[in-house]
Regions:
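Hydrophobic alpha-helical segments and helix pairs
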Residues: 1-25, 133-175
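Intrinsically disordered, low-complexity terminal tails
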Residues: 1-70
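Protruding loop/beta-arch "assembly-hinge" segments enriched in small, turn-prone residues
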Residues: 1-30, 287-319
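Short, solvent-exposed amphipathic alpha-helical segments in soluble enzyme
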Residues: 165, 233-238, 312-314
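Extended oligomerization regions of viral-like shell subunits
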Residues: 197-290, 297-300
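Assembly/oligomerization interface modules of large self-assembling protein complexes
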Residues: 59-144
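Alpha-helical scaffold segments that mediate packing/assembly in large oligomeric complexes
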Residues: 143-214, 317-319
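Short helix/loop capping segments that flank catalytic or ligand/cofactor-binding pockets
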Residues: 118-120, 158-159, 227-229, 306-307
Length: 319
């Protein structure tokens, strides 16, 4: 049971396992089906065990994690989850079709040669072929990270939910930097249209360039997204409860500072882009456990590759 687990630093260093995965092996969630703890994962059960409240009106201070050597072991996972939540709550999920974990810093994906026309075939004629081969150009994975400086004395009396907001903001900005790499990959050799001044008809023209795929997403800079939102054709558009806005033809309008003001990217999020990582978010856990918060690094090593070039089109604004 969760009350009997011995928490120690080594749980962060098991090969191929996250801290939560290691806890789940010791305290499987399957054992709690039908109980009041069924909604909690193994890490959350440890927070309950030590009565550490990370949100709500009775939220604890950061120092609650350091009440004992065992509770201190839980602190890096709290930091990691907050940063990861910020990282995941970004436009990355709006532009990524698939996520791949690579064991190497160089990644060679597969390439589909699908250029032969589709159509009817006579009985005596060979079927047109689609060929999948290994790519010839490797994607180099690069590290993107941040150094977090904080003293224990500065944050020990800070509420965990407030500190968590700060960490999530770091995760968001880290992810937005990663999105810059995604934009570069999407734009590379992409077909599209050109206009001297952005109008709704240009967006409709971009939409019409998609034949086999759907333009599920329109990615634009904040300034261009604002211009699109102000167009007369958008006056009846309504943002959903989650803040998402859609163009009349169904494409989600997504803004990102990683896109320049001369570019609008249309894509089918289900086919366009592969997000490749060699690791998840990497955090220096030992220092956090030992209250050495003055130089904590968080990073992700990643790259992007277009899976289906036809699922991406670009509108270029020349003025």
């Amino acid at each position: 049971m969760y009350n009997d687990i011995k928490l120690e630093k080594g749980l962060y260093n098991l090969s191929g396992k996250s801290f939560t995965s290691a806890l789940e092996e010791l305290d499987p969630s399957a054992a709690y089906v039908g109980t009041e703890l069924a909604a909690l994962d193994a890490y959350e059960r440890q927070l309950k065990r030590y009565n550490i409240r990370v949100s709500g009106t009775e939220c604890d201070m950061v120092e609650k994690f350091f009440a004992s050597t065992e509770t201190a072991v839980l602190f890096p996972e709290f930091v990691s989850r907050c940063i990861k939540k910020g990282f995941d709550d970004t436009v990355l999920k709006a532009v990524t079709a698939v996520r791949t974990v690579s064991e190497s810093s160089q990644y060679l994906g597969c390439v589909l040669d699908d250029s032969t026309a589709y159509g009817t075939t006579a009985q005596t004629v060979a079927l047109p072929a689609s060929t999948v081969t290994e790519g010839t150009t490797a994607v180099a994975l690069e590290k993107i990270g941040r150094l977090i400086n904080a003293s224990y004395e500065a944050i020990r009396k800070q509420r965990l939910d407030v500190f968590g907001v700060m960490l999530r903001s770091i995760g968001i900005k880290l992810a937005n930097t990663v999105v810059g790499k995604a934009v570069t990959a999407l734009k590379a050799d992409a077909a599209g249209v050109t206009t001297s001044s952005l109008s709704y008809s240009d967006l409709a023209d971009l939409y019409g360039k998609f034949d086999n795929f759907n333009m599920t997403t329109v990615l634009a800079s904040p300034a261009i997204a604002a211009k699109i939102a102000a167009m007369d054709q958008m006056k009846d558009a309504r943002a959903k409860a989650d803040g998402k806005m859609f163009l009349p033809f169904g494409s989600e309008l997504v803004k990102s500072a990683a896109v320049d003001d001369a570019t609008v990217i249309g894509l089918d999020r289900d086919f366009a882009l592969e997000f490749i990582t060699s690791t998840g978010l990497v955090l220096e856990t030992d220092k956090l456990i030992d209250r050495q918060l003055d130089q904590i690094t968080v990073s992700v090593t990643c790259g992007f590759r277009k899976v289906t070039p036809d699922a991406v089109k670009v509108l270029t604004i020349t003025s």
